[in-house]
Every structure is written in structure tokens, then in C-alpha cells.
Amino acid sequence: MQVKRWFLNNSLRNYQYLLYDENYAIVIDPLKADIFDEFIKQNTLKLEAILITHRHGDHIAGVKKLLEIYPDALVYAYADNELFKPNIYVADGDFVDFGFTSCKVMYTPGHIDDHVCFLFEKEKALFCGDTLFNAGVGGVHAASADVNQLYDSVVKISSLDGDIKPYPAHDYWQSNLDFALSILPNDESFNYYRNQVAELAAEHKPVVNLAEESKLNIFIRSISDKSLLQALPEYRLGREMFVKLRKLKNNF
């Protein structure tokens, strides 16, 4: 299985993902149906499934059009939304077998209450939607958002094998690292990656594994990294530090 990534260059800086082999394809969180349709047709693939991490519009807007073109594709999601009902409802710990590959469902609320991630263990790929970003985490602005649930979800993801690569739904590399450097301006990892991505177009930015992400993500580091106590000594590591950082990032 291969992962195809597109950057949409829209105001939300969305990434779009498609998994495929020589015969089949799986779409993740389609915003723009046309790019998927073009690739599927060019490579003579069969669209087997559409996986939805959560119900925000920039993750589901392309579903209806894809289903018009590929009516046999099955939609997997945690809950209903305003545009469609999924064919298959998923829950935490579910194992989904597509025949040519499979994934495990991880319930990861916090950004919104219906959020799930899809872990393809064989491919070492985690499609994490808006829960985890490179160097950051999802916002907590939705009505059903909960920063404590987001913390628990990030802890869950951070406990996965370090060689698994997270594929987030947005490119927020620079802004997240700028925020991290506002807290720890001399941090080696933050400075290294900020320099690495500064001149790269979004479509060329790296896909790092969780072992690397744990070094460059201040929110993952807030779980246990004592260096944060130097910058924010009045907060305890773990949930308290994470919540404080999320509040600071809201106003950054």
C-alpha cells in the first residue's frame, strides 16, 4: 500500500490522503472530490472505502460527489453528520478489514466529540485528522470540544510504536513551531525543524514518525518533559501543562 498526499493550498491548509495498491483505493476525509476521482481513474483503481475522522465540513465536503461517481464505496465514520449517514459506524478498538489491507479505529475526542483516527499497522500509518498535527494538536473551539479529552487522546497516540507515521489533516508546521519557540526559544529540536521546514512548500514537508514527533511537538512533550518546567514552573507536567499550553496557543 502507498500513501498519496495532496496539499490544497486553501485557507485551512488541508492535506488530502489516498491509500492505494495496484487495484484498490481508500480515501480519507475528502474535501475536494475531483482530485481523488482523477487519480483513481488515471490508475484504474476501485474505490473501496471513504474514511471520515470527524464531521467538520473540510473533512466531508467531497463525500457526496465521490459517492455519486463511486456508489459502491462504503463510508466509515463514528457518527452521522449533516451531509450523509455512514454505511458503517466505527468505535474505539474496531478492526476494519478491507481485504487488501486493514486498520484499527482509535476514538480520539477533544477537538470534537466524534473524532476517530485510523491506524494502518502494517503500513505504519496513522491518519489522525485534527487530533494531532506536526508540532501541535487540534483546536478546542467546537461546541463539543474538550481540552481534557484532547489530552487523553494525545496521550493515547503518543503511546503507539515510535515508527508509526502520523498523517495530519493540515499543514501547520510553521505556526506550531513558532509557538513552541515562544515557550522554549533555545530548544534544539524546535529550532532544527523550524529551519528545516521554513523554505519547503507544504507538499514537500516531511512525514515524520512518532519518535521524531515526540521531540518536536511541545504538546506531547508536556506530558513528561521537565524542560517545560523551566518556562512554566507554576504548572505540573501532564494534563495541567497541556491545558495551559493549549490556552496559550489559542491566543498566539
UniProtKB/Swiss-Prot annotation:
Zn(2+) 2 binds at residues 58-59, 130, 170. GO terms for biological process: methylglyoxal catabolic process to D-lactate via S-lactoyl-glutathione. Its cofactor is Zn(2+). Pathway: Secondary metabolite metabolism; methylglyoxal degradation; (R)-lactate from methylglyoxal: step 2/2. Zn(2+) 1 binds at residues 54, 56, 111, 130. Coiled coil: none annotated. This is Hydroxyacylglutathione hydrolase. The lineage of its organism: Bacteria, Pseudomonadati, Pseudomonadota, Gammaproteobacteria, Thiotrichales. The gene is gloB.
